[in-house]
Amino acid sequence: MFGDFVEKLPQKLPQKLDIPLIINVILSIAAIALIRALAISILRQYRLRKLPLVNGVGVFESSQKAKQNFLFNAEGLLENGFTKSTKAFRMATDDSEVLILSPDYIDEIRNDKRLSLTHALAEDFLGHIPAFVNFSPQKGLNDMAGDILQKKLTQSLDLSTEAALALQEQWTDNKEWHALNAKTTMVEIVARISSRVFLGLELCRNPAWLRITADYTVNVFFGVMALKKWPKYLHPFVWRFVPEVRTVRDQIQEAVNLIQPVVEKRTAEGKSPSSRKTYSDTIQWANELANGRPYDPALLQLGFSLAAIHTTSDLLSQILYNICAYPEYIDPLREEIVTVLKEHGMTKAGLFKMKLMDSIMKESQRLKPGAMLMMRRMVLEDITLSNGVFLPRGVQIGIPTRSHFDPSFYTDPERFDGYRYVKMDDDPQREKSRHFVSTSPEHLAFGHGKHACPGRFFASQEIKIALCHILMKYEFKLADGSKPTVMKMGWVLSSDPMVQLMVRKREGVDENLLYK
């Protein structure tokens, strides 16, 4: 009705312009529009406020109390929230309120186009700030990266040699027991393996690039946390002066200085048929898939580092901790590796056949996913769910990983069972969801639905190749006194960065199997 009035307004104006009248009409329209917007906003907030709030603060309490409570007790707050409402509740975080939904809504929201992961990440990681431009939904880097991950990345499996070289450097050929930091070495190894595919031989062993790709994610995290200490309205003005944010900007420039010459060299080669070469890495694939879309090659590579290095190395570390805690799985794993590699070699088909390894990976991820809240989304349009729960535009939502410990899905869910998913081979209803790369309502570690992690297939191959080399070449165990503890910060769950492993090189092993 209001739109019709605006469309017909020119017909109702007098032929002879009356400037004061026109000004009054314009001001009236603006006032009506403002009142309408305020009324809608108030109504949205009213409907949202009907849901219980966990971690709120009193009138005379500082918001810092809620932030600290969230950062150090998010898990307890989630459990408390579900005692107040089994459907949905609000929770104050270090940045804003998030609407927590019951896992019952997983299938209802998983493919809803009105819910955006990229916009949620942009809000969480301040994508409007130039230093954190990788999180800006307007840059299109997420679409470009998604295309590469889905269409190209798993076409290459030239990773076994790189895994061998990286592991030899980190764990050495020492046949005597020696101590090392598990997670630090996993970050270095995963960075090398990933960079082999991301950047090819030109840069994958470059110490400067490996330092950037290992540090960038951590620096972004600390940069965002440092800037969030300032009021939001000051972010556009103070970000240049925050030391942690400047570090991120400096690293972006370092990445540009390393990657741009490679891109320019390849562009020059492409202009001459005699010097044209074929490359199999993300620099080449991005050029092929761009289809006219502008993108920054350095930012794209840093985006891959954000998505791949620390998430994969964190999970690989946790898997090693679990194998150390349950050493009875080591011999069956080695037997599986030898059997599969003899028949299939280090191929995609071979890696897919490693069912016990796949099960141990998935079980490790079930018990310790990367975060306790998954399926993060920003609501782009007002939505009313099937049972009446209202999701107002502009609010973030998420679903906890409670289903990972639901006894209706898992027998004895608190216990680590390396064969848990192998046993599902005999269950036709769950056979498809048993694979490490499969997503389902009962296993949300990679998300579920439209925004499920597109890099999970590459991560699976990468982890399996690394485990094959580690298990076949080394004996390893927890150092005396090392007791891995899951580190919790806000939603994030991290494997223990302080764990020491004792390792030594095995003797009498046919390592040629690893390169078939």
UniProtKB/Swiss-Prot annotation:
Q: Quick check: keyword Translocase in the entry?
A: no
Q: Which residues cross the membrane?
A: 22-42
Q: What is its EC number?
A: 1.-.-.-
Q: Which GO terms describe its molecular function?
A: heme binding; iron ion binding; monooxygenase activity; oxidoreductase activity, acting on paired donors, with incorporation or reduction of molecular oxygen
In Gene Ontology terms, what is a biological process of this protein? terpenoid biosynthetic process
Q: How does it sit in the membrane?
A: Single-pass membrane protein
Keyword ATP-binding in annotation: no
Lineage: superkingdom = Eukaryota
**What cellular-component terms does GO give this entry?**
membrane
Cofactor requirement: heme
User: Quick one: which residues bind heme?
Assistant: 453
- The top EC class, named as a word, is oxidoreductase
Pathway given for this chain reads:
Secondary metabolite biosynthesis; terpenoid biosynthesis
Entry keyword set: Heme, Iron, Membrane, Metal-binding, Monooxygenase, Oxidoreductase, Transmembrane, Transmembrane helix
* Location within or outside the cell: Membrane
Main subcellular localisation:
membrane
List, alphabetically, the InterPro entries matched.
Answer: Cyt_P450, Cyt_P450_CS, Cyt_P450_E_grp-IV, Cyt_P450_sf
**UniProt function note:** Cytochrome P450 monooxygenase; part of the gene cluster that mediates the biosynthesis of the meroterpenoids nectripenoids A and B, as well as cochliquninone D and isocochliquninone E. The pathway probably begins with the HR-PKS ntnH that catalyzes two chain-extension steps to form a reduced triketide, which then primes the SAT domain in the NR-PKS ntnG to initiate three more cycles of extension to give a linear hexaketide corresponding to the polyketide part of nectripenoids.
As for family, the record states: Belongs to the cytochrome P450 family.
Please state what the protein is called. Answer: Cytochrome P450 monooxygenase ntnM
